[in-house]
């Protein structure tokens, strides 16, 4: 072995020996493992550092000092550092937190004293849903399904926007589709399994329905369009539709040529390689007759029409507190298991406490409101209180663009908590629109039974109405 290699080897051995000696002679308790044990459990050396967490600036609303069971709405707008306090319940929250959430959801921060136990989540803001964006700035969609509201097993919702001339491409799906036009105008088109055709133009407030499996297309007219889609399957996804582009892209060109009567293979050279979903297109002709294509089977009979011009219909019920406009298979037969109500609630008024016997409800706020059962809020600000049996009850807050879902038989009310009208749609999977009004129920029950059960006086029970009130003035 060369002398320089031998010298380097000897030096390495000496260094290793020195490290071993240093390690064996190290003072006890200086290693990382040993010192960390002094932080486990009680040790008088680990003194507590007291901090005054109550020393925060905040203010309470007058309603927060009332009996918690009164449960008045808490408007935290302009309130300094809102706190989770109701009557004698709750306590201070020094943070960390985002007070914007508390302002939007005051009944989560400081719930009424009547809330109790657990109720499955019944609210989802579509603004928190992932937006699926179309091509060429032609539009977008966002959805709510069981991924967002797990209890919403019967229905799912999609909010879709098409810019002027924009298409929702030719497609079909395994779920039935019920739709309400929120704003703008749209041309809808479909072909049945018998070869009958359908085309119509719809405006804000109108409704359409396509049965499961029926292919259809949508195109926005001048000014664009936005609409709510409700599907009869809580797990429905916009990503699971059957698309015309994919039908052509996923079949061999030779088969396409045979299928269409011997067209040359070159006819398929420029078909899209995948989905278009939402894309810009040639503006629809002003004269709808130009797109009224008819084969030997003719057009769909009027009584089986896929559209209903609900915007032209009168309100079903008008009260001092608002109005209700009902559409169900009695007036729109093709939608055999979709019933809905467009509800307007004036500030301070309440959609009376009720429940649905036939189905769950999905609700959505439209312009500034909400939907129940399956509901969608169009406009306004509201809260829904849900009683779910076994002593369980919970209150949820809703704003424009929010969805709600209330399972069958659970009582609920919708209270307008803002200064503008609340407008929402409640959609049922039912062959007619119906509910059980708590007010009418006790009003039509012998007074003695009600007084004995609820410990109420005769003067109180005598004020109960024998007819549904639908929307009660605040």
Name the predicted role of every residue range:
Residues 164-167, 172-194, 347-392, 400-402:
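Glycine- and acidic-residue-biased ligand/ion/polar-headgroup-sensing regions
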Residues 172-175, 191-194, 222-223, 232, ...:
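Short coil/turn segments at secondary-structure boundaries
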Residues 26-29, 34, 203-204, 209-244, ...:
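Ligand-binding loop in jelly-roll beta-barrel domains
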Residues 224-285, 421-474:
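Active-site-adjacent segment of 2-oxoglutarate/Fe(II) JmjC oxygenases
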Residues 26-154, 258-342, 456-474:
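A short, N-terminal "cap"/entry segment at the start of jelly-roll beta-barrel domains
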Residues 1-28:
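Fungal secretory targeting signals
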